[in-house]
Design a protein with these regions (language model features):
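A glycine-rich, acidic short-motif signal
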Residues: 1-212
Length: 212
């Protein structure tokens, strides 16, 4: 990796810092520090995503992220999954989705997470309120379909990562203490079962911006 400095014309560390802070849509606070990793070994509340740097086309690239789940390593997820996690948790300025109807850009997001249980099924419902615009032909006429397509993509991504990696992209576990006290007390004893027993549902509410 250090050999790439000659190709880049600058130190790899400086290049990566520029990519993460000035080019990427991901906010700086999304990336954990050494201190936050140690802190989570005690707190065991957060799911953190650490960029895994490789070389692509002779330049450093991040295509996967290590997962640090409640103070323990939990394997790797691809960059798309990490991007959704950052956007869900208000740690991304703009989130782009390439859909059949066009390129959907979502920004200015806030989210609301609620917890429910019915007939033994526990759900975490994530409602994302955001601004949206479409790049491509026919986008304006398909706004309703685009919103549903975005929901479907997010729900499939969250379900796949939860089932295959036992990782929750929403960061909902850390909210249990204030929003679902009964769940919190239960999962303090068996937190390893949380991702297996809770279904995540995304709802996307878009305030459309029509570009001239």
């Amino acid at each position: 990796m250090l050999a790439q400095s000659e190709t880049l014309g600058e130190a790899v560390g400086d290049y990566l810092e520029e990519q993460f802070e000035n080019v990427s849509q991901i906010k700086k606070q999304a990336y954990p520090t050494i201190g936050s990793l140690y802190q989570e070994m005690d707190n065991r509340q957060e799911t953190l995503f650490l960029p895994y740097v490789t070389v692509k086309d002779e330049k450093p690239a991040v295509e996967q992220y290590y997962v640090w789940k409640r103070g323990m390593p939990a394997g790797m997820v691809d960059a798309e999954a990490a991007r959704l996690a950052f956007f869900t948790q208000n740690r991304m300025r703009e989130y782009g989705l390439t859909l059949e109807e066009g390129m959907l850009l979502l920004s200015d997001a806030t989210n609301e997470i609620t917890f429910s249980e019915k007939d033994g099924v526990r759900k975490v419902v994530v409602t994302i309120h955001c601004s949206g615009s479409v790049q491509g032909t026919g986008g304006k006429e398909n706004e309703g379909k685009l919103a549903l397509s975005a929901e479907d993509y997010m729900n499939r991504m969250a379900a796949n990562v939860r089932q295959e990696k036992q990782v929750d992209l929403t960061g909902s576990y850390r909210k249990l203490g204030g929003a679902a006290r009964g769940w919190y007390e239960e999962y303090q004893e068996r937190g390893e079962n949380y991702e297996e027993e809770v279904e995540v549902v995304y709802r996307v509410k878009i305030n459309w911006i029509h570009l001239s």
